[in-house]
Swiss-Prot record:
Na(+) is not transported, but it plays an essential structural role and its presence is essential for fluoride channel function. It catalyses: fluoride(in) = fluoride(out). This is Fluoride-specific ion channel FluC. It comes from Bordetella bronchiseptica (strain ATCC BAA-588 / NCTC 13252 / RB50). The lineage of its organism: Bacteria, Pseudomonadati, Pseudomonadota, Betaproteobacteria, Burkholderiales. The chain crosses the membrane at residues 2-22, 37-57, 65-85, 101-121. Na(+) binds at residues 77, 80. Fluoride-specific ion channel. Important for reducing fluoride concentration in the cell, thus reducing its toxicity.
Length: 128
């Protein structure tokens, strides 16, 4: 059972801080005027890592809750961003670059799903 233990709060806070910081750095380094590469990168990397973490956590039920909370709820929650993706897509639509908006939305959704599957498959292959 998950509790409101101080360690759980700390784990989420530290993980979220690190994930949000990495997303900010990716945005600074990679986002351009025409295509938000930083946000896409954060979401694709986050998709892969959530697949990895889901598979690892499933294969290690003995791990304490704070590990999952730090990695998944904290770090990956801070790294990935559906709200920024949505705002960037709507901005593209408002600017009339419909093909770019559709490509970005498609790449973000399909790419994140594919990366999550790849993360799961990677761990399952390595644990054989």
């Amino acid at each position: 059972m998950l509790t409101f233990a101080p360690l759980n709060f700390l784990a989420i806070g530290v993980g979220a801080t690190l994930g949000a910081w990495l997303r900010w750095v990716l945005g600074l380094r990679l986002n351009g005027a025409g295509w938000p590469w930083g946000t896409l990168t954060a979401n694709l990397v986050g998709g892969y890592l959530i697949g990895v973490m889901v598979a690892l956590i499933a294969s290690h039920p003995e791990w304490p809750a704070w590990i999952r909370l730090a990695a998944v709820t904290g770090f990956l929650g801070g790294l990935t961003t559906f709200s920024t993706f949505s705002a960037e897509t709507v901005d593209m639509l408002e600017r009339g670059v419909y093909a770019t908006a559709a490509a970005y939305a498609g790449a973000s959704l399909a790419g994140s799903l594919a990366m999550t599957g790849l993360g799961l498959a990677t761990v399952r292959l390595l644990l054989r």
